[in-house]
Amino acid sequence: MAQRLLLRRFLTSIISGKPSQSRWAPVASRALQTPQYSPGYLTVTPSQARSIYTTRVCSTTFNIQDGPDFQDRVVNSETPVVVDFHAQWCGPCKILGPRLEKVVAKQHGKVVMAKVDIDDHTDLALEYEVSAVPTVLAMKNGDVVDKFVGIKDEDQLEAFLKKLIG
C-alpha cells in the first residue's frame, strides 16, 4: 500500500511538473534513478513514468447536440442508427436508456445509438412525431424503418435491432 502511495505521489509530481513536498520524494527520486524499480509486483522505469498515452474511444452511443449534428450523425449515417428520444424527468427513460445502450454495445458497431433530449431538441421531436417518451426510432439510410414507444425488455430490444441490421 505504501509503495502504491509513494508511486502515485511521484507520478503526480511528474505530471504536474512540481516537485513533491512529501517526505518520500528523496526516496522515490533515488529509487527511480536506478534502471528499474521493482517493489514486489510493480515495475516502473523512468521512461514509462513520464509517458502518457491517450487513445480515442469510439463509442456506439452519442448525444445529439443540435439539428445539423442530427443530420450529420443520424440521417447521413451509413450505419443503422437507433434514436432514443428521452427526457431527464422521465422515469421509464431512465430504465430503458441503459438497457438500450447495453444491447447496442453487444452489436459491436453494426448499429449506433443517438440520444435526443426532447426538452433540448423539441424541433426534432416534432419533426419525428414524438408524442410520448421514451420513443425509439430505427433509422437506416436516413429513413425511419421501425419505431416503438415505452419500455421493452432486453430480448425485445435485441429482436428490434436484429430486424434493423437485417
Swiss-Prot record:
Keyword Transport: yes
Compartments where found: Mitochondrion
N6-acetyllysine carried by residues: 152
InterPro entries for this protein: Thioredoxin, Thioredoxin-like_sf, Thioredoxin_CS, Thioredoxin_domain
Transit peptide: 1-59
Main location: mitochondrion
Alphabetized UniProt keyword annotations: Acetylation, Disulfide bond, Electron transport, Mitochondrion, Redox-active center, Transit peptide, Transport
Role summary: Important for the control of mitochondrial reactive oxygen species homeostasis, apoptosis regulation and cell viability. Is involved in various redox reactions including the reduction of protein disulfide bonds, through the reversible oxidation of its active center dithiol to a disulfide.
PANTHER family on file: THIOREDOXIN, MITOCHONDRIAL
Protein name, UniProt field: Thioredoxin, mitochondrial
Organism of provenance: Bos taurus
